[in-house]
Every structure is written in C-alpha cells, then in structure tokens.
Regions:
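Conserved DEDDh/DEDDy metal-dependent 3′-5′ exonuclease domain
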Residues: 1-70, 220-327
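Long, low-complexity intrinsically disordered regions
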Residues: 8-118, 122, 127, 139, ...
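Acidic, Mg2+-coordinating catalytic module of metal-dependent nucleases/exonucleases
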Residues: 40, 47-102, 308-380
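C-terminal extensions
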Residues: 92-213, 223-229, 234
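Short, intrinsically disordered C-terminal tails of secreted or membrane-associated proteins
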Residues: 400-403
C-alpha cells in the first residue's frame, strides 16, 4: 500500500509497488497481482487498486539492472536530465554543480529529456557544442521533428551562448515594467497551494510604498498574509482579500509566473465578481516572469524564481526550503493533535517562506526597473541582497525583515 500526495499516479509509484510486490511474494507464498494506493479526495481518503502485471515487472527488472550496473562502476552514473523531482534530495546541490561544470545539456533552459536526445542524435552533447551551432542550421535539423522544435532552436543557441559567457543579454528595448513608472506603490503577491485539496491556503502580499521623491525603499515594505481557514469559508476569505486589494486599488500587483493570476481570477469568478471588476483586477496583475522572458536572456539553467533570484544573490532565510516543504508544514499545522507550540512554529515557517518569495519577486522586478545590471553582484547574507538593483534607489541598506 502506498500513500499518494500528488494528483496522479506516476511511473515511480507503480515501480515502487512492483518492487514491494516482488519482496512480498516469498512471504505470502504467491504472486501479488495488485497494489493499493491511498489518496485524499477533499477530507475523505480514497483507495485505488493498481494492477501489477508482467509489463511492470519487466520495467522493474530493467531498473534494477541499471541500478546494479551503476553501483559496480568506479564513476557515478550520469546525472538525470530532469531534476525537478530532486528538490528535497540532499545531493541536489552537488548534482547541480556537477551538471554546470560538465556543461550538461539538461542545464540549458528549454531542453528536456526528449529535446536533449534530439540534440545528441545530431552529435551535440554539451552546452559548449550547442553554443557553437549556427541557429538556422539547427532550426532546419530540428524542424524534422516538428515546427515547435524548429522555432525554438535559435533561442536554444542564444541561451547556451549566454550561459557560456555568464552574462545576460537584452532581447527587447524599452522598459520591462512601464506600469511602475508612475505607481504610488506595488503589491508583491505569492500564494501557497495544496494541489490535493485544490485550494490556495495562503495569499501573501508584500506592500511596498513609494517615497515622496519617487524612490523604492524595500525597508519600508510590510507583509500581509491572508490565511485560508476552513471554518471561515471561501466567501468570507474573498471579502477579506477583496477589501485588502481595494485599499490599494491603483497599485499594480506583481507576481512571478501565471499561477497567482489564474488562482485569483478563478476565486473572483467563483464569488460572482462582475465582469468589469474582474477585468480591472486582471489589468492590475503583472507577471514578472513573463516580462523577464520577453526582455532578457539570463545565464541561468532555469527561469524559476529560485534560480533567477538566486543569480541576483537574493537568499531565502530558510535555506533549502521549497514549496513542497511549505505544503508539508501546512499539512502538519492542520493536525489538531499537534502541540500548540509546534503548530505556531510551523505557521511561522510557512509565512517566512511566503514572505521571502514576495521579496524575491521584488528583487527580480527591481533588476528589471534598473534596465538590469550586466552581472550579478557579490553574494549577500541570507534573507537579503547586495544587488544594487534592489537597494540603490534607497539611501540606507535594507536588512532582512523580521519573521512574521
């Protein structure tokens, strides 16, 4: 029996069940044809039966043979292409360093396992080789696999060249965030979600006013978390959220990625917000990630917030924390049997992580506002940044805000 946290049953889940079934066979004196998976539908647990046929046993054989061969070698096995599932692994940082040192193609933004194989079939095995390619020739060759691969080829070459040089490259002229030129302030917005329950349990805002002389001063920012409590209901939660947004009705809402905009608009729609008000809310929302991708190429393996803000030397106060860990803390916090002191600590950690995500979003936005310095500055202490794009507009250096 396996407890599944995500929405879908993955190949890894099935292989693990197949392994357990094989280990149980001699103890039970017979084959184990099925596995059980427990998941959650709302507040109710549900069970799914999984057939463990011969096909999965063959795949398990192959996986075990590959593992045995890797353990016999003197050198470590090749780094996997997709390391997004490795964020909680203690080896994650070391693997990333090795991939960067070796020029692993999987470390070029836009290259997954399938596209990497296409490039290797063309004799392109490393970032250096990709950077040397003629964009038009590569587009023609990848075009045999479809228009999508042909169209992205020139950008892959440019991205590889930027990563090889270690310097950003501007793609589009003009300001990346013109909406902020006359804004009295901005709201930095980040949500934390539970995908199993399909709920956004925390809407976090960093309120950043502008000084009378037009400077942006992050040290004047204040954090406003709106926690979804099941006992209050979504309608009351929306009224609190709507009241906060209306208080700063002319301020742009900056977020990193499309998740926040989609979630907020869906919530407004479920609460019966008139179309005109929904359109006004949509017009206030600015996706910093989309603006960054339109205007710049960066020497980063990923354009996720952690990667980009880290390149700008922003540091989260809780090292190594990802959204998955914040979700785990949330689920533990919801356990009423947990000691009160432990629950307070969990909530504090969740809010600190969310606040730092908001602050990291501002670090990227501030870099864009400056027209972007041509390199990342020296490392900053945890929770802060020495990036001049973040602090240069204020007379004093902003240190880390206290945890909420």
């Amino acid at each position: 029996m396996l407890a599944r946290q995500g929405r879908r049953l993955t190949r890894e889940h099935r292989l693990l069940l197949a392994l357990w079934a094989r280990l149980l066979e001699p103890w039970q004196g017979g084959a184990v044809p099925f596995g059980a998976v427990l998941a959650r539908a709302g507040q109710r647990p549900v069970e799914e039966r999984v057939r463990l046929g011969s096909g999965w046993q063959r795949q398990l054989d192959g996986a075990l043979e590959n593992l045995a061969a890797a353990l016999e070698r003197d050198q470590p096995a090749a780094i996997v292409d997709d390391r997004r599932k490795c964020t909680l692994c203690s080896w994650h940082g070391l693997c990333g360093e090795e991939a960067a040192r070796a020029g692993h193609l999987g470390d070029v933004s836009g290259i997954g396992g399938k596209r990497r194989q296409m490039l290797q079939d063309l004799g392109i095995d490393r970032l250096e080789q990709l950077a040397e390619q003629d964009p038009e020739d590569l587009a023609r060759q990848l075009g045999e696999h479809g228009d999508q691969h042909r169209d992205v080829a020139p950008m892959l070459v440019q991205q590889a060249r930027v990563q090889r040089r270690g310097q950003p490259r501007r793609l589009a002229d003009g300001p990346a965030l013109p909406e902020l030129e006359d804004a009295a302030g901005v709201l930095l917005y980040d949500i934390e979600s539970d995908p199993d329950r399909r709920e956004d349990f925390l809407h976090g805002f960093l309120r950043l006013p502008r000084s009378p002389d037009g400077r942006w001063c992050p040290e004047a920012a204040s954090y406003h978390p709106l926690l979804l409590r099941a006992d209050l209901g979504e309608d009351r939660h929306w009224r609190r959220l709507e009241g906060f947004l209306d208080r700063y009705g002319t301020w742009p809402i900056l977020h990193y990625g499309e998740t926040e905009a989609i979630a907020l608009q869906r919530l407004a729609r479920r609460q019966g917000v008139p179309p005109a008000a929904e359109q006004a809310l949509r017009a206030r929302m600015i996706d910093v990630h989309a603006r960054l991708r339109t205007h710049w190429l960066l020497p980063v393996p990923s354009y996720g917030l952690k990667s980009v803000a880290g390149w700008l030397d922003f540091r989260w106060r809780q090292a190594g924390v990802e959204g998955a860990r914040a979700l785990l803390w949330w689920r533990l916090w919801n356990d009423a049997r947990a000691p009160a002191a432990g629950r307070r600590l969990l909530l504090r950690r969740i809010l600190t992580y969310n606040q730092d995500d908001c602050r990291a979003t501002w670090a990227v936005a501030a870099w864009l506002l400056q027209g972007a310095a041509q390199r990342a500055p020296d490392p900053a202490p945890t929770g802060g940044s020495t990036n001049p794009a973040v602090l240069e507009s204020c007379s004093s250096t902003a240190g880390p805000e206290p945890a909420p």
